[in-house]
Regions:
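Conserved class I S-adenosyl-L-methionine
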Residues: 1-39, 41-50, 143
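Class I SAM-dependent methyltransferase SAM/SAH-binding core
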Residues: 51-96
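A conserved beta-strand element that flanks and buttresses the S-adenosyl-L-methionine
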Residues: 107
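A short glycine-rich, Lys/Arg-flanked "PGG" loop and its adjoining helix->strand segment in the class I
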Residues: 119-131
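Acidic carboxylate diad motif detector
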Residues: 137-139
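Short, glycine-/aromatic-enriched active-site segment of Class I SAM-dependent methyltransferases
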Residues: 141-159
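Short alpha-helix
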Residues: 160-175
């Protein structure tokens, strides 16, 4: 089974029980950092939207959102939440519908955790970004004991990988990006935060 299929299977099997008080608590702390990078009332691609936490936050802030995920079951939950709240967004599991389109903001939250080499995914995300746009990505922070608890638990499904800030910078550079900002979440104190939140711009020279 390919890594993508492993990740899809993991989230299809967990979709019904994915949302819980712990993930909501951590997710809200991550959103506080993400909101600082994503202006309200802009167009956003939320790549790997899951059950919609980030997508719904964008929608609440007046953004026009395209939401993509490889898990049909996770995406269905996100779409149902949006409909219940009276929001409209473009939900899809078909990457072909993203081809040839670009956005000023692309968010990719909690996706790169599972890729031993994130550079190929970052290169794909670069094709969806306007030349002056911003890509917002997250990684488990290898300097945080909280992140290592998460890493330990993930080994029973699809193992996640923790990253140092230096690794994030190198991977971004390999994919043609430069770091515009790097912050921490849960807590928002460097270097203890569980999550690294990186804002990336395309390298121009």
């Amino acid at each position: 089974m390919t890594l993508v299929n492993q990740v899809r299977h993991r989230f299809d099997s967990r979709a019904a029980n994915y949302d819980n008080p712990l993930t909501a608590f951590i997710g809200e702390r991550e959103l506080r950092a993400i909101r600082k990078l994503v202006p309200p009332h802009t167009e956003v691609l939320d790549y790997g939207c899951g059950t919609g936490r980030t997508t719904l936050d964008h929608l609440r802030r007046g953004c026009k959102v395209t939401a993509y995920d490889i898990s049909r079951k996770m995406l269905a939950i996100a779409e149902a939440k949006a409909a219940e709240m009276g929001f409209e967004a473009g939900f899809t599991t078909d990457p072909g519908l993203l081809e040839g389109r670009t956005w000023p903001i692309v968010t990719c939250i909690g996706v790169l955790d599972y890729y031993p080499d994130p550079a190929p995914v970052l290169k794909t995300l670069r094709t969806y970004l306007e030349p002056s746009g911003l890509l917002v990505v997250t990684f488990p922070n290898a300097l945080s004991p909280l992140a290592w608890m998460y890493i330990a638990g993930s080994r029973f499904t699809v193992p996640a990988v923790a990253r140092t800030p230096g690794f994030v910078r190198r991977s971004a550079a390999r994919a043609g990006f430069r770091i515009a900002s790097l912050s921490y979440a849960f807590p928002g104190i460097p270097p203890l935060g569980h999550t690294l939140v990186a804002g990336l711009h395309v390298q121009t020279s």
